[in-house]
């Protein structure tokens, strides 16, 4: 996993502490788009561009929000190739029909946009990236911030009414999103990229302890924060939809398959079958990326055949309607 140091690309490995625990670096770009005009970035249809990977759960959050809010015409999108090699994310539409080119600066690699935004940038080159076409700058590269902006700030240009952050539930949404981040969203990476047995064991214990907790929680209500789909569910969904196809095998998160959790599994099916969400899920990109982009985890790049999943299968969550 490379990174940029003072604007220069380095392929040096990073990510673990001295005890073998995977450490995720904080994102750097944190500006906000405000509907009230109180920031340097006002809401304007056509001004902003979203860079994503269809494989990445963090980027997937933002693509779902864009779809649920009907922002396809207001915010354009580019998709990187699923393979993340030594040069990290790359634009290669010639090699994959679901990948695109870069319309902003004609970049071959995503890191070129980071260098354009900050010639002295030091940090990881990650998706999602919310780009301002007008100034040629990165507005934000934190998935939770972008999800929140798409949820709350773009009402004037949205074509669908879908409140992912209802005022009455905001404190609970924030609490739940915080609660699932370390053990589940980042927990699968803590397990998969652990450099010691102790670090792996700790991550797996945290992960499945949290899954057990939310399995019980979802036995009494349809969604994480009650009866409506919110940002917290989007953050949970993008991890769960990758669990059996990838994390269970590739990241050795295999105490149980998600399919063995009846409430979590049916909850996953329920969200997947929500209008406009299924089309944001690309299992080919997901499996190809993980199995072929992490040589320290899977040196031969062999893509596992299973587990087979049917996300269109009937679910039982209507019992809470």
Residue ranges of each PLM-predicted region?
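C-terminal alpha-helical interaction module
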Residues: 1-321
């Amino acid at each position: 996993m490379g990174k940029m140091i003072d604007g220069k690309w380095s392929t040096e490995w990073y990510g673990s502490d001295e005890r073998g625990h995977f450490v995720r670096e904080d994102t750097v770009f944190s500006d906000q788009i405000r509907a009230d005009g109180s920031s340097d970035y006002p809401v304007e249809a056509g001004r902003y561009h979203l860079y994503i990977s269809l494989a990445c759960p963090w980027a997937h959050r933002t693509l779902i929000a864009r779809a649920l809010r009907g922002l396809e015409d207001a915010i354009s999108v580019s998709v990187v190739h699923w393979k993340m090699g030594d040069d990290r994310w790359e634009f290669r539409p010639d090699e994959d029909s679901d990948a695109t080119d870069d319309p902003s600066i004609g970049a071959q690699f995503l890191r070129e946009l980071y260098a354009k935004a900050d010639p002295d940038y030091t940090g990881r080159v990650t998706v999602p990236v919310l780009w301002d076409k007008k100034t040629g700058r990165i507005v934000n590269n934190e998935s939770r911030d972008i999800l929140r902006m798409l949820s709350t700030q773009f009402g004037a240009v949205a074509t669908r009414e879908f409140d992912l952050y209802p005022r009455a539930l905001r404190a609970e949404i924030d609490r739940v999103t915080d609660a699932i981040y370390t053990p589940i969203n980042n927990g699968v990476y803590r397990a998969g990229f652990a450099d010691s047995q102790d670090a792996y064991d700790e991550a797996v214990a945290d992960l499945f302890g949290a899954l057990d907790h939310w399995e019980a929680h979802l036995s009494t209500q349809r969604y994480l924060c009650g009866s409506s789909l919110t940002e917290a569910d989007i953050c949970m969904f993008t991890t769960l939809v990758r669990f059996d196809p990838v994390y269970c095998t590739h990241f050795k998160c295999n105490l149980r398959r998600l399919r063995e959790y009846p409430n979590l599994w049916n909850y996953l099916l329920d969200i997947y079958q929500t209008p406009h969400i299924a089309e944001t899920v690309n299992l080919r990109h997901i499996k190809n990326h993980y199995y072929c982009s992490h040589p320290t985890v899977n040196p031969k790049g062999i893509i596992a055949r299973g587990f087979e999943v049917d996300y269109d299968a009937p679910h039982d969550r209507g019992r809470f309607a």
